[in-house]
């Protein structure tokens, strides 16, 4: 066992934190990303715990906070993000100790629950070691864009092509690019929301998709001057697949949903393999009309009560924009 100590993040730790993230293959963290995610989140006190050994940082576990509708009430939900442990300190309880430290801090600032989307390795730790509970997972849907993409994925052949097209100001089919979100976007979300989900008001939407250092394309569907829906699309490469991803979609009627989905497809450059999404049950027909199909892949979802109340087990709605890595 290697000796280490734990402590809260201090500003002087930032460069060592970045170095650890890069060393474990998570190099997207830089000053701009850090300041946006941790310092400008409109609903988030900064919560980062570190493990130190021999004068360096060997472990990190952070949490972000999001205003969330839970059983019709607005609550503050804590979400673990940006976790890393130096190789020689793995399987020694570093992550578990940092995570429990964060859970205690989150409860102290008023978050009654915490949820996350674990990978295969962290799922066992969350559920078996830390007392989290499995919640209904979410199936990934995909709109294939290249005929050979599925076969190439099955064979493990990676793609580095595709991406987002150059930005265009063109309005087509009642859908136009959105520069920033106004109050009408938050009002639209409020009028259509069902189930348990993160609050999408004007401040959140602009922080998440406009002020971000990441590249997102935002579109609004209009009837005359009235906003009737909006969508956000981005691009990533995961497991060798060049994928567009639907970060968000809010539209009360199927016509606008389909129009927005088709515009998101058009925004992806040649070489992109697919556009992926998480699909609410009531939206499935619109996604089928836009060429999406359900895949075999499901995203794990786990949660834990921090105040002793029963954890809502069903009726959760998430989008890929709710993940810290999209």
Pin down the residues of each PLM region.
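Glycine-rich acetyl-CoA-binding "A-motif" of GNAT/NAT acetyltransferases
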Residues: 56-60, 226-229
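A short helix-loop-beta-strand connector motif used in the catalytic cores of GNAT acetyltransferases and
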Residues: 29, 39-50, 59, 127, ...
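Conserved acetyl-CoA-binding loop-helix of GNAT-fold acetyltransferases
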Residues: 85, 90-104, 254-267
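Active-site/acyl-donor-binding loops of N-acyltransferases
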Residues: 112-163, 232-258, 262-326
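GNAT/GCN5-related N-acetyltransferase fold signature
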Residues: 51, 63, 85, 233-235
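Short amphipathic alpha-helix that is part of the acyltransferase structural core
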Residues: 1-38, 42-57, 63-65, 75-79, ...
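Conserved acetyl-CoA binding element of GNAT-fold acetyltransferases
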Residues: 74-87, 241-252
